[in-house]
Amino acid sequence: AGYGSTSNSCAIVRFSYSTYQGVAMAYEGMHYWADWSNYLGGPDVDESGLVAFHQTGTIMIEAPGGHHEKVVPLLESLNIPHEHWSVEKLQERLPLLTDGVFGPAARPDDDAFWVEPTERIIGALYTPDSGYVSDPQLSTHNLQRAAEAKGSTFVFNRQVVAINQEGGRVSGVELDDGTQIAAPVVVNVAGPHSYLVNDLAGLAGTMNIGTKALRHEVHHVPSPEGFNFETDGMHVSDGDSAVYFRPETGNNILIGSEDPECDVKEWVDPDNYDQEIQQEQWEAQVLRCAKRVEGLGLPHEKKGVVDLYDVSDDWIPIYDRTDLDGFYIAIGTSGNQYKNAGVAGHCMAELIMAVEAGHDHDADPLRVNGRYTGVEMDLGFFSRNREINPDSSFSVNG
């Protein structure tokens, strides 16, 4: 399991969303990773071993008008531990970070990219409970083995070619080898292919929020000489430079993009897209990071991964029922929901049980309490028929 886009996730566990419900779900979701062995049923559930949750903490660079201004009140409202660090404390903890204000983001072929900063950042927002998961593909294998221990069966290397229906509700799926799988409930969790699966179910045009596949690159570069970022680094969200980065094995730094407006978005066919790292994007992301990380070079050899986000119209996921009874969706995850695997599964299970028992979720949106924090999550917030949320970052930040 997990050899789709999940295997190339940056697997960052953070709480810096733009909305109360987004932050609440992410904080609840973190507790699944912190309790991973118990959640799965014990340390021996997977012969390949269990993933590690590296709880390094996250620092978010605070620049004037930055994303932290939206995040801090949400952290406070949910009593999520956080600290404000001065520039001095930030550089004491991570001495290789520079303190200039570089935004708004530009590309290296723009003269504005090379202008020396004249302002200094405010400091950093630190959340000690966040971090990253060591191996996203292994984490899905962990879940596979735990599910199999509870009686689940997995089928691989087959394509769904039809969503079967009978009497106005779903009745199962047909696979490309002719296999018919009968099921009273079907859940679309097809990632970047989710809109195609919805089309198979005859649901095109029935939702107010749509999804489509976005090509994205993540790059790997060596840590600057003299600093071991793998052991001494942490997850850094730098909206001012339009990148985020975290430790990677082999004393490398993994660099992702925070989707600045100057970068052209590549909407693609999920079955046919360029899977090679592009020189222009390689230079843009690595050089942006090099502004913040002193001594970071631009290697000649490009290393990293190319994969897809399943992006909703407002970069907020859709966790909902559909107009086809028995057919549910957990889609539009927009590159920011890996961390929520556990809590999203809990919410979907509660939703499915309630709707199948007769609850009218569209008229009376279900509210679900987190199993760890007890926080109440309003599933109406993730409705397929919501209006586009103006509070969203409209980026991977959610």
Where are each of the predicted segments found?
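C-terminal lid/capping helical subdomain adjacent to the catalytic/cofactor pocket in oxidative enzymes
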Residues: 84, 323-398
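Active-site substrate-recognition segment that forms the wall
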Residues: 1, 11, 35, 41-57, ...
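Mid-domain beta-loop-alpha active-site segment that forms a flexible
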Residues: 125-145, 191-193, 240, 277-288, ...
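FAD-binding beta-loop-beta segment adjacent to the flavin cofactor pocket
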Residues: 96-99, 105-117, 298-343
